[in-house]
Amino acid sequence: MSKRLFTSESVTEGHPDKICDAISDTILDAMLTEDPQARVAVETVVTTGLVHVVGEVRTSGYVEIPQLVRDTLKEIGFTSSDMGFDGTTCGVSVSIGAQSPEIGAGVDTSHEVRGSSSTDEDDRQGAGDQGLMFGYATNETPEYMPLPISVAHRLSRRLTEVRKEEIVTGLRPDGKTQVTFEYDDAGTPVRLDTVVISTQHDPERTQDELRELLSEHVVGHVLADESLKPFVTEDLNLLVNPSGSFILGGPAGDAGLTGRKIIVDTYGGMARHGGGAFSGKDPSKVDRSAAYATRWVAKNIVAAGLADRAEVQVAYAIGVARPVGLYVETFGTEKAPVEDIQRAVAEVFDLRPASILRELDLLRPIYAQTAAYGHFGRNDLDLPWERLDKVEELKKAVGGN
């Protein structure tokens, strides 16, 4: 049996790119609170002492963007210039323009409605852009996520928890985690090989102290879960701040940008990605809503016992309501013919944008909570695309062939 090692990473909410995702999604949520039909595309850039918010918006509401930016930074933990960034005193610049009327028209009145006499309301809304989106699920974990990204997220969330609750003192907001699992030839995880923890910290903290404290309170805490014990061996390779001191972090260490952690946001590299980011985009943008919908589809396929792993691709043309492509991949793990599974998916799930918005109830301020620690497999959140409400319909549709 060959030794195959697969790695996924996560980052904490204090990572510069994740700061930007949080700001963009906080602004989005505020706009959806004021106007559920708001069209929002907000990008954030952070650098030393300064936050830039840019984008295009169409809304009947008003939100105080600079205050939202400062509140988000302080909630993450950037409250002092001593750590290189202070949400109270940093500069905030805002450059928000109007959504292109041509894009807006294509979303409001789809190609189908403009070109025919269709009276189906779900045909009225066109896709906000062309593109391809992927959803994925696997039975490796109870949350139907790949094990490496699941554990990486648990570690990064715990790293933030011990900082905020002062279980470990002297930590700062920026941090990253990475895990490597050994897989057998059947594609099953068999052993945890390497864990990497990098965390920003106060100058007074030594690396020996950090290794001891994080080994106990972060790594040990997470790996004590009964479901993970079979993967842990004595030869686990644990690396804590392997580059040495990490005092300067956050925006003072690296500039950050919305949408630059798309693999962290999804499946840790275990599945394909269409390239579109999520944060700062209202759900008329299929980059976001269709990626959520295909996760919903894939998760229900696996939960229905139709495959051990499932990846679903959907594709759209701008201004067109009906998808131009649907593709189901089961990697040889299917329990029924793939063509029957794909036919059942097309029968059970309506992937037109208007239907996705209605079925998943997406015109709500639910997005800021997803800005860090992944958009999928979040048992700590009540996310509509994680529901297993189509399992029986899929079974019936496949069985009725």
Curated annotation (Swiss-Prot):
It catalyses: L-methionine + ATP + H2O = S-adenosyl-L-methionine + phosphate + diphosphate. Residues 101-132 are annotated as: Disordered. Residues 99-109 are annotated as: Flexible loop. Transmembrane segments: none annotated. NCBIfam families: metK. Belongs to the AdoMet synthase family. This is S-adenosylmethionine synthase. It comes from Corynebacterium urealyticum (strain ATCC 43042 / DSM 7109). The gene is metK.
